[in-house]
Amino acid sequence: MSSTDFKEQFLKNNQPPIFVKLLAMLSLVRWYNVLLVTTGLYLSSIFMLQDHMPKVDVIKDISLHINVVAIAFLIMAGYIINAFYDFEKDLINHPESTVFGTVISKQFCLNSYIFFLFVGSSLSILLGWKVGLFNLLFSSGLWIYSHKLRQKPLSGELGASILTVAPFASISLHYMQHLQYPIRG
């Protein structure tokens, strides 16, 4: 397919190709931040538990992987809802990089938010009610932060700080729930 065929197909359908939507979605969920947080979660798990479990056993723990994937989905949902509430401001401040309306619709983003929230919450509940409840509170906190807190001077910074630490607290809570050993501080 030549570039002119690609342009004709794009203009004829008035819809961007699916891979363009996928790239826009990856940009919207800030995949590089999610990758950084997941790496931090794995490293903190290994070093938090180093006195109680061999590193290989920590890495082999399927529940750790489920929790990290659940947290990653919830973080991506948080980025989507944050971008949704920032839509009007982004159109004014930097319209050339706004993906809503041009590449992906607001409805698609809301549907993606609900999907990511559902997957993250479902995986969290599989790990136990305490982790499920904590991660549900975390995802609610992300929504409250995006919708209300971010504009407020002191509560916005405090909320962002708490939400930054919350995924690591979820990992700690998971291991306190499933191990007979206390986690060293």
Predicted regions, residues:
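Multi-pass alpha-helical membrane architecture of UbiA-family
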Residues: M1-G185
